[in-house]
């Protein structure tokens, strides 16, 4: 038996256990001052990797001769050469307090090496860098960041790890609950983990579930899947950059495309980029404000229940009661632009092109601006949610321009005879951790203006609650009433609107 022990500050005694080691030596190479081992075979190697903190682990060595090395000393005339490392089955146990990983990985030879191009599907493509074959298969089980994790994968040969200029091939497919992460590609400078270039796929019940696996804070959504290229430059001392390029996928029934860059560092990591949906199903944005999305809603609810969230919409209430998770808003910053080009929605909600600039900094969230088309006109708003306040403080400044009255309620028959346009401005302030709470105690002002309009008399009678006149009009015919100008000024206090001017 060969046993490699741990440093004194590591609680476990053994780092590596080798029951048996076999090697061959090429004796003639000694004549040229070369120690040449054509192969070395390890029988059932067992390694235990432990990290207690960012700077304390059992795989970083400081050799005794390193500090006392003579700068003027001549290099040794002897050299060492190892051509191959073989083993039947290996086991790697990982106990990482930093990433909360407690994993057991079993490594088996594939029997016959698999070419990199065969596994990744890049056969026949020009490849300037030579990538080694896949030599070993992996099976993993355990927990990562406190979440259960299982998976399989493939990696290159052991000797490929030492080549600084040779990319090391990796492939894996992991699952945590209903969340799946699959990738294939290369690791650059694997001994120092200098970076990766991977084709990366995600799928699951909700984007919010990725927080536990990746540390990236994303909103709750309907079921999703994405496929893109991840290029990362890793520097554990300073800052690492993860660039998810040109991804395509879907959220619910909506397609998504874009690129996102996640940068670690102080005081908080940051997510930046652009995301676009060419055909956006408006209901798929529902979970962002606590509204069921329809398709996949049950999976989204299961995702919330798994995280211990209780989401019960009171009977007879329209405004969403789901709470915003403001306690997580300070884990990272964000600067992301989103566009929804073609909007799918019910005929009763005439919304078109949507765009917004999302800025999250130190738990302070701004949608600045939020724009979309509505009823032939446009809505522009600035939304500010102070997630660092308890309860959350919210403010909305909204401008509505050239909304066509006929298109505001296309399903209402009486509105089809209505002509004219509506303009308005609203300023609202409120507090609370849900849409219902924010609007339920909101204060502010609403101004509306209509000019050059034509309105159904019956509609005016209904609005005025004059039911008798409406019945007469319904029996003997309806007239149109021309409206040269109509204006309203409403003050809002504790969620109740009171008209100051209505003319």
Where are these regions (language model features)?
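Residues on the solvent-exposed faces and adjacent turns
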Residues: 6, 25-27, 44, 51, ...
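Extended terminal
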Residues: 235-237, 242, 247-273, 288-291, ...
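Amphipathic hydrophobic-ligand
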Residues: 8-25, 37, 97-112, 145-156, ...
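Transmembrane beta-strand segments that form the barrel wall of outer-membrane beta-barrel proteins
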Residues: 90, 167-172, 241-248, 338-341, ...
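Secondary-structure transition motifs
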Residues: 2-129, 144, 271-331, 453-478
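Short, highly charged
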Residues: 332, 337-378
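Hydrophobic residues on conserved beta-strands that form the core of alpha/beta folds
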Residues: 1-4, 18, 37, 42, ...
């Amino acid at each position: 038996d060969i046993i490699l022990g741990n440093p004194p500050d590591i609680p476990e005694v053994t780092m590596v256990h080798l029951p048996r080691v076999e090697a061959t030596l090429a004796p003639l190479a000694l004549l040229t001052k070369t120690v040449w081992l054509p192969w070395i075979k390890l029988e059932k190697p067992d390694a235990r990797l432990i990290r207690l903190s960012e700077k304390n682990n059992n795989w970083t060595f400081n050799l005794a001769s390193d500090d006392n090395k003579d700068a003027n000393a001549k290099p040794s005339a002897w050299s060492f050469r190892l051509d191959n490392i073989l083993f039947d089955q290996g086991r790697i146990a990982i106990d990482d307090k930093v990433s909360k990983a407690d994993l057991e990985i079993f490594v088996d030879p594939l029997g016959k090496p698999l070419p990199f191009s065969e596994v990744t599907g890049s056969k026949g493509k020009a490849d300037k860098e030579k990538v080694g074959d896949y030599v070993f298969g992996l099976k993993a089980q355990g927990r990562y960041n406190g979440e259960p994790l299982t998976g399989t994968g493939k990696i290159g040969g052991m000797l490929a790890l030492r080549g600084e200029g040779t990319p090391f091939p990796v492939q894996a497919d992991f699952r945590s609950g209903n969340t799946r992460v699959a990738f294939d590609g290369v690791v650059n400078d694997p001994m120092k983990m200098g970076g990766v270039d991977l084709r990366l796929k995600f799928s699951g019940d909700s984007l919010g579930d990725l927080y536990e696996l990746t540390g990236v804070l994303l909103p709750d959504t309907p079921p999703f899947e994405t496929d893109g290229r991840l290029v990362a430059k890793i520097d554990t001392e300073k800052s690492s950059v993860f660039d998810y390029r040109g991804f395509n996928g879907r959220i619910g029934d909506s397609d998504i495309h874009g690129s996102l860059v996640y940068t670690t560092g102080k005081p908080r990591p940051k997510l930046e980029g652009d995301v676009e949906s060419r055909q956006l199903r408006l209901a798929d944005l529902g979970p962002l404000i606590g509204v069921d999305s329809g398709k996949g809603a049950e999976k989204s609810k299961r995702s919330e229940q798994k995280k211990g969230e209780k989401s019960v919409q009171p009977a007879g209430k329209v405004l969403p009661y789901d709470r915003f998770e403001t306690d997580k808003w300070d884990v990272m910053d964000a600067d992301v632009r989103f566009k929804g080009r073609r909007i799918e929605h019910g005929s009763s909600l005439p919304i078109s092109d949507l765009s917004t600039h999302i800025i999250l900094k130190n738990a302070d969230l701004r949608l600045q601006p939020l724009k979309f088309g509505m009823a032939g006109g446009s809505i522009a708003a600035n939304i500010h949610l102070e997630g660092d306040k308890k309860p959350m403080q919210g403010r909305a400044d909204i401008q509505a321009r050239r909304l066509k009255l006929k298109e505001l309620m296309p399903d209402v028959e009486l509105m089809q005879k209505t002509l004219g346009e509506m303009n308005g401005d609203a300023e609202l302030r409120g507090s609370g951790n849900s849409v219902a709470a924010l609007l339920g105690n909101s204060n502010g002002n609403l101004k509306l203006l209509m000019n050059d309009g034509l309105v159904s008399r019956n509609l005016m009678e209904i609005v005025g609650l004059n039911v008798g006149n409406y019945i007469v009009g319904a029996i003997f015919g309806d007239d149109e009433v021309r409206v040269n100008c109509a204006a309203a000024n409403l003050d809002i206090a504790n969620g109740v609107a009171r008209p100051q001017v209505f003319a």
